[in-house]
């Protein structure tokens, strides 16, 4: 059923306006013995009126497979996400984007409305801030105490374009658990993630990129891990 819905969403995006579709593939690994290889494919479109749609599918190495540091091995579904949003531009500097994200796994659905504000400080520098609460329904826990996790994330971004075709960005995300499962990192009810992204606009279609992030490695200790990502975006 999920595959049918994803196929329908992709077909709708492509058929509406093939000149404004972006396809983004990304591979991820962490600095651990297992490496935690993951992949995701994102297809998105922003209409001329500001309305946008995106669909994302994710894969990860099966938890039952203990083969260390082997990408694309025993991959299984790692969830899907569909996002609908609308960008309203006040002027050439300020814009606001309300949206809604539905993230689904094999035993849960995560409902995440959000609001993002963006400012183009200069032609090369932009900043953004997003507030996104989450309401995660754990269908796998029906009949148990914890069937709903609630909280929110605050995400700040700063992006700078240099040498015409290069863009470097820094992202800081703060996640807070308020009810249900609230232990997120180091026995605390919050978690912080840092991420740096460097992209290169090869031409009007291709944009490869690399990312390096610092993420929590445990819910009960102060362990931190380095996360590496490499990907490419194709727009047509």
Swiss-Prot record:
An individual GO BP term: oligosaccharide transport
Keyword Ion transport (UniProt): yes
A cellular component term, taken from the record's GO annotations: pore complex
Main location group: membrane
Keyword Metal-binding in annotation: no
Gene Ontology molecular-function annotations: porin activity; voltage-gated monoatomic ion channel activity
Signal peptide: 1-20
Subunit structure: Monomer.
Family indicated by similarity: Belongs to the oligogalacturonate-specific porin KdgM (TC 1.B.35) family.
Protein name, entry field: Oligogalacturonate-specific porin KdgM
Species in which this protein is naturally found: Dickeya dadantii (strain 3937)
């Amino acid at each position: 059923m999920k595959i049918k819905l994803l196929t329908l969403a992709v077909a709708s995006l492509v058929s509406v306006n093939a000149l404004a579709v972006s396809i983004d593939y990304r591979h991820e690994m962490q600095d651990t013995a297992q490496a935690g290889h993951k992949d995701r494919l994102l297809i998105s479109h922003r209409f001329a009126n500001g309305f946008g749609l995106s669909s994302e599918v994710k894969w990860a190495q099966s938890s039952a497979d203990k083969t260390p540091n082997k990408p694309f091995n025993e991959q299984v579904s790692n969830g899907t996400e569909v996002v609908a949003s609308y960008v309203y531009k006040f002027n050439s500097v300020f814009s606001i984007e309300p949206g809604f994200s539905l993230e689904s796994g094999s035993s849960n659905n995560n409902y995440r409305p959000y609001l993002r504000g963006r400012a183009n400080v200069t032609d090369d520098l932009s900043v953004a801030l997003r507030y996104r609460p989450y309401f995660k329904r754990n269908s796998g826990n029906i009949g148990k105490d914890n069937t709903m996790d609630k909280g929110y994330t605050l995400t700040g971004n700063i992006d700078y374009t240099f040498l015409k075709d290069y863009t470097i960005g820094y992202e800081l995300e703060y996640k807070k658990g308020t009810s249900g499962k609230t232990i997120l990192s180091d026995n605390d009810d919050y978690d912080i993630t840092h991420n740096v992204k460097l992209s290169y606009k090869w031409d009007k279609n291709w944009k490869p990129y690399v990312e390096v992030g610092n993420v929590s490695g445990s819910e009960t200790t102060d362990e931190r891990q380095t996360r590496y990502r490499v990907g490419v975006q194709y727009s047509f």
